[in-house]
Structure formats: structure tokens, C-alpha cells
């Protein structure tokens, strides 16, 4: 036989089909053996570059389902021994060209004896009483390699060279078994060994009932992936995984939802999807009673109770509950930023960050609040915003009892009690409680001002400053005093103004007891007690306790007239005189609630 000989094979040449009655009479061991051999045969054919056949059959083989249903459309025969040629309605293997050395040649003997004579049945209308099916494997170098590979997975379930595994099929009867072995061949011996023995992994000590399962498990430790996809080169440790993967390339989605028509390439994906329609949540937490649709979500939730974090970063030792979280974290160490914006070229280490960034260019805010109409880029932002309307504050501080509507706000608050300042500046060593404050501080060293006003070009280091500045151009004053109707463009200005009506002075000097409306006024006042004069004139060295006083003094050196014109035709009045007059008319307390900028 030439090494390059090619033959055409149909699915019937390598498959064995059963009726529902026949399949029901097989015991568990016989079914398992059949399914494993069929799966391995399929994987072998795929590794040789053969086209993918029906994914339904692969799924049923892999999940131990009723195989007579998977193959009943391939044959009209009621039993395997029927001499009538099966009528194939939809062949799954169509003219597969294979090397002859690796073909499984099914030989139906025509006798009840070993000399292949056709046995005569007592009932001529039924099937023959004795039929011997010999499964013989051709001899050749390619066959030897494949046989060795299969034997390593099944502990010698394949036959030796030239040895025929003989299984005698008796007449089908509802009273007896379908198959009876007349001799202990290699297949039977292997099954007996697997029944009696257990197989233990030397790496982790895990025990398996079958050697095939042990071999598959050991690939976790050895990282061996012998099954390679011919389309993309991706490798797999199991042939079934390769078969499932190949459906991605074919684009076939045979599992369709009857409710909405959505299709899937795996039955398990369809099952999970159908729970959306049924509302089924089969995975319930025994700790808190919360139920979940998917097992993976349930496992992650359960770790929140146990505190288990099995995924540990080898670089910094940080642990994570799930693998995606670990992968996202690890990119920090590698510095990789694979997600790049096509508009401006900015790169990100997470896809979600790129998505958020792209909304700056598009301006899309698809998530709108039903209460106030405010729109958001992310659904999570909308959910957090909605708590403002409900007033719910589920996150409570155990130290002081203060409640918050966000977990992050609670964590930030708790640092007040612990004194923790995890964000330290590498330039000056100053530490900060909040990351946002730390980022703003770093910009004082770098001089970065990323927020620029489109109207006047003025740049700011903080986004909030840009928003406050922009109201100057719009003239908008959304903050109105309910007492007098005066409007302001900043909420802080409204707060200061309202203290005129309330007379509230929350900032009190601990030295003399004098109270102030603003903390800035208290700070300036406290310098009187300390005697500190931090503002020094560079010309003469004279020091002052206020910046405004230094500015007024420097006019002496510059020769600038320190007077202001109040009105045309009226006499000049010095700034100090103006202050004295205002003190007489309005009182000193009024000056404490006005800014120095307004005085000059």
C-alpha cells in the first residue's frame, strides 16, 4: 500500500448509529466508551484538515446526550446489522480525502464462524443471529504516530498492530443485553483496569477515575495543547475545544432562541440567554440569599463573603477575585496601552477607558435620567446619579454613623478616621487622602493645564475651574438668593451672600473669640495674634501681614499714584481714607464679609 494513497470516506464509514431502542439497552460504560471514541475520531479527522461537520453532534457527544437522536437522520436502518444501504438525508462527512494508513476499515463478516460465513437466522424475517464486526487499523508510519497519541490518552484502548478487536452482536431482544463480548480483547481489559484503578496526578494529587481524564488534566501543568486550528493557529488541550472553536470561523449558529430569535453557536450560551426570558436564577447564595442567573457571577459573589482572592500579581503581590480584574491590573506593570483613539491618537490600557474617551469627540450621552433629564455617557453614572433623587444612602460609616450614597465616598470619608493618606507626591513628599486632590497637586509641579476655554483660550488645571470660568462668558447666574433675589454664578458666592441675611459667623478665633463668615478672613485675622508678616517688599525689605498691604506699599517705589478717582469733579480720596469712611458708614463687621478685591 503506497504511503500517499488517498481514498474517499463518507460519514457512514467511520460512524456507528443506533436506534432509540438499541441505545437504551447500552449500559453506562458502553455509552461512555462509544462517545469517547467518536469524539477522538472527530478530533483526529479535524486535525488532518477535514471540514467541520454538524456542531449539534459534537455538542451531544461532548455532553453525553442521547446519540441515537443525533444520528437518526443519517440512516433509515433499524439496527446496525441491517444489510440495506443506509439512506443519508444530510451527510456530515462528504468525501473526506484521508491517507489510507489512518483509515478505520469496517469489515462486516458474512458468517457466524471466524471463517466469515454468513450465519443463518432461525427467524428469516429478522436480522441474522450472529454478525461479527471487525475494526481493523491499517499499518503505516502515520498510523503509528496517531495510534501512539491516542493510546497515551486512553491507556491502551486502541488495538495492537494486526490485532482485531472482535465484538459479537446478538439478536436484539428487549429481554437481554444488546452486546456480548465473547473474549477479553484489549478494549475489555482496558475497561476492567479503569473500573478497578484510580489515576492520581503527581503534580497536585488530584485523583481521577479514568486515565483519559488524568491525561487531559495533566495538560494544565504541562501546558501541552496538541490540537491546533488550521484557520488561525490557536491551540487547545482538548479536541472538543477545537471543534467548538472552529464554529467561530464557520459563523454557524445552530442554537436559536424561540422567544426572540437570537442565535448562538453553543447550546450552553442559548441556555443562559433563555434565563433572561424565564427570569430563572438557579444559583442562590446561602449567605445572603441573593440569586444569580449565571454560575460565574455567583462564584464571584460568593468570594465577597469568603474574601477569597485566588489571582495574585507576581509583581506587587496584589490579589484579585476574578481573572479579568487581574489581567487589567497587570497592564499597569507592563505599561501596555493597546487601545488607541483614532481621532487624537491617545492610548489607553483598558477598552472601557477608550470608550469613555471617544464620547468626548462624539458628544454622545445615551443614558438619560427620567427625573431631571440629565444625560450620561455610562449607565453606571446614571445609576449613581439616580440615588440623588431617591435620597438613598446605603453606605454607612461604622465610626460616626454618617451615610453616603456611594461606596467610594464612604471609603474617602473613612480616611478621616484612619488618617490614611495613600497618595504621596514624589516631588515634594506631600501626601493626600484623595486621588483627585493628588492629581491636581501634581499639576502645580508640571504646570499642566489641560482644560482650555474655547472662548478666550484661558487654561485651567482643574475641570471645575473651567466650568466656573465659562459662566463668565455665558453670563449665566443660576444661583439665586431666596431672600433678596440676587443671583450669582457660583454656589460659593451665594453661600457667602446668604450669611448677610442669617448673620451666621461659623469661623471663630480661638485667641480672642472674634467670629467670621469666611475661613479666609479668620486666617488673615489670626496673623495679628501670631505677629507673622509673610509678605516682604523686595525693594526695602519691609514686611506686611497681608498681600494687599504689600501691594499698596509697593506703589511708593514704583511712583504710581495710590489714589483712585471716585467721580469727575470730586476731590481725590486715598484708599485708606475710603476704608475709614466705609468703616464709619457700614461698620467693621461688614468689611469682614467682603473680599479685598471689592475694596480696591
Swiss-Prot record:
UniProt KW keywords: DNA-binding, Metal-binding, Nucleus, Repeat, Transcription, Transcription regulation, Zinc, Zinc-finger
Domain KRAB, first and last residues per copy: 9-80
One annotated GO biological process: regulation of transcription by RNA polymerase II
Pfam name, any one: zf-C2H2
This protein's record includes keyword Zinc-finger: yes
Entry-linked InterPro entries: KRAB, KRAB_dom_sf, Znf_C2H2_sf, Znf_C2H2_type
Biased composition (Polar residues): 110-121
Record-given protein name: Zinc finger protein 543
Amino acid at each position: 500500500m503506497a504511503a500517499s494513497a488517498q481514498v474517499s470516506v463518507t460519514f457512514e464509514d467511520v460512524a456507528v448509529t443506533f436506534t432509540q431502542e438499541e441505545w437504551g439497552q447500552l449500559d453506562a460504560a458502553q455509552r461512555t466508551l462509544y462517545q469517547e471514541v467518536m469524539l477522538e475520531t472527530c478530533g483526529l479527522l479535524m486535525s488532518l484538515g477535514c471540514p467541520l461537520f454538524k456542531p449539534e453532534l459534537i455538542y451531544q457527544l461532548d455532553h453525553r446526550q442521547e446519540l441515537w437522536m443525533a444520528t437518526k437522520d443519517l440512516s433509515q436502518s433499524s439496527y446496525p446489522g441491517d444489510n440495506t444501504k443506509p439512506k443519508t438525508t444530510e451527510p456530515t462527512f462528504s468525501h473526506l480525502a484521508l491517507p489510507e494508513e489512518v483509515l478505520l476499515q469496517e469489515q462486516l463478516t458474512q458468517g457466524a464462524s471466524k471463517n466469515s460465513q454468513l450465519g443463518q437466522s432461525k427467524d428469516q424475517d429478522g436480522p441474522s443471529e450472529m454478525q461479527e464486526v471487525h475494526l481493523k487499523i491499517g499499518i503505516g508510519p502515520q498510523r503509528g504516530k496517531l495510534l501512539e497519541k491516542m493510546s497515551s490518552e486512553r491507556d491502551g484502548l486502541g488495538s495492537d498492530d494486526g490485532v482485531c478487536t472482535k465484538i459479537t452482536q446478538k439478536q436484539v431482544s428487549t429481554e437481554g443485553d444488546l452486546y456480548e463480548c465473547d473474549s477479553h480483547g484489549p478494549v475489555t481489559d482496558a475497561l476492567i483496569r479503569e473500573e478497578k484503578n484510580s489515576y492520581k496526578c503527581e503534580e497536585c494529587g488530584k485523583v481521577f477515575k479514568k486515565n483519559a481524564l488524568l491525561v487531559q488534566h495533566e495538560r494544565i501543568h504541562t501546558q501541552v495543547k496538541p490540537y491546533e486550528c488550521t484557520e488561525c493557529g490557536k491551540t487547545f488541550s482538548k479536541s472538543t475545544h477545537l471543534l467548538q472553536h472552529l464554529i467561530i470561523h464557520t459563523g454557524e449558529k445552530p442554537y436559536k432562541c424561540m422567544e426572540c430569535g437570537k442565535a448562538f453557536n453553543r447550546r450552553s450560551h442559548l441556555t443562559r440567554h433563555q434565563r433572561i426570558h424565564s427570569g430563572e436564577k438557579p444559583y442562590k447564595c446561602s449567605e445572603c440569599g441573593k440569586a444569580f442567573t449565571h454560575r460565574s457571577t455567583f462564584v464571584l459573589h460568593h468570594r465577597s463573603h469568603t474574601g477569597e482572592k485566588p489571582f495574585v500579581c507576581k509583581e506587587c503581590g496584589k490579589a484579585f477575585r476574578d481573572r479579568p480584574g487581574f489581567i487589567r491590573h497587570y497592564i499597569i506593570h507592563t505599561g501596555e496601552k493597546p487601545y488607541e483613539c483614532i481621532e487624537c491618537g491617545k492610548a489607553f490600557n483598558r477598552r472601557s477607558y477608550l470608550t469613555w474617551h471617544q464620547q468626548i469627540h462624539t458628544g454622545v450621552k445615551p443614558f438619560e435620567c427620567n427625573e431631571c433629564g440629565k444625560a450620561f455617557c455610562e449607565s453606571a453614572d446614571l445609576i449613581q446619579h439616580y440615588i440623588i433623587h431617591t435620597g438613598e444612602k446605603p453606605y454607612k460609616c461604622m465610626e460616626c454613623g454618617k451615610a453616603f450614597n456611594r461606596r467610594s465616598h464612604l471609603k474617602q470619608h473613612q480616611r478621616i478616621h484612619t488618617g490614611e493618606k495613600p497618595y504621596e507626591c514624589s516631588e515634594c513628599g506631600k501626601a493626600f487622602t484623595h486621588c483627585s486632590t493628588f492629581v491636581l497637586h501634581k499639576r502645580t509641579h508640571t504646570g499642566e493645564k489641560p482644560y482650555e476655554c474655547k472662548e478666550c483660550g484661558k487654561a485651567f488645571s482643574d475641570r471645575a475651574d473651567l466650568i466656573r470660568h465659562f459662566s463668565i462668558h455665558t453670563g449665566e447666574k443660576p444661583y439665586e438668593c431666596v431672600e433678596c433675589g440676587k443671583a450669582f454664578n457660583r454656589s460659593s458666592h451665594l453661600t457667602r451672600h446668604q450669611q448677610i441675611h442669617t448673620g451666621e459667623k461659623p469661623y471663630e478665633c480661638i485667641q480672642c473669640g472674634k467670629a467670621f463668615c469666611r475661613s479666609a478672613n479668620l486666617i488673615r485675622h489670626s496673623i495679628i495674634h501670631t505677629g507673622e508678616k509673610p509678605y516682604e517688599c523686595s525693594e526695602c525689605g519691609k514686611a506686611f501681614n497681608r498681600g494687599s498691604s504689600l501691594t499698596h506699599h509697593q506703589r511708593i517705589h514704583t511712583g504710581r499714584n495710590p489714589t483712585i478717582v471716585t467721580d469727575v469733579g470730586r476731590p481725590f480720596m486715598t484708599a485708606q481714607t475710603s476704608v475709614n469712611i466705609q468703616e464709619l458708614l457700614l461698620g467693621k463687621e461688614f468689611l469682614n464679609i467682603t473680599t479685598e478685591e471689592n475694596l480696591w
